[in-house]
């Protein structure tokens, strides 16, 4: 009876071990039947991975239950404090989670920088406008001052030329030793140049007054500044030449015959003619300034 019970217990144990529902057979590497389809811990056929503890898988959904990959290993906790050699080490930016925040931060910084630059340009625009307005006002004041100076020198030229040719035209003596300016070509040359300079300076004085009053010349043409500059240069050289010739004639007369009333009047006329030359030289500088300033603008 005892033998039968032992045999039956052995057969039951063997049948229990060979049973497909037995957990021993489920974990046995010698099992040929594989896992039961009804089991929760079913692994797919031909899976290259062996799951040692299937219960560790969280049953979130069917895809997670039947995943052939093992569960990810959680990262180790950080060390506090870090080792001395790692305190100054740079953290590598390899993870995808680190890339997106850094790119977003850089993008935002670019947008902010652009906005600041745009604001700076807009704020600087009125300053440039004020500077240009101030420059225009200063230029207008400078033009007015130049116009008044030019008018003053034109009036001076008119007065000096009138005095010079008037004295030369009146240089005549009576008597047996009488003499006249028209007998000497140097004096006639000086008289003619002073008359021409007087006519031109009178016309330019009227033109300058018209420009100050109406801001327009009497004769508006494209080459007005060039004409004025050329005439000022020409008459200045002519006055210098005529005055020098007349002064040479007076010096020759005084060295041979001495001083008298005739030579004294000629000397006075020549001196005023030199002063007129100085006024025309200043007018030539003013006209050259106007010419090159208007040409550059």
Swiss-Prot record:
InterPro entries: CASP_dom
GO cellular component: plasma membrane
Entry's localization field: Cell membrane
Stretches assigned to the Cytoplasmic side: 1-149, 213-225, 287-297
Biased amino acid composition, Pro residues: 69-83
Main location class: membrane
Region feature (Disordered): 1-135
Protein name: CASP-like protein 4A2
Organism of provenance: Arabidopsis thaliana (Mouse-ear cress)
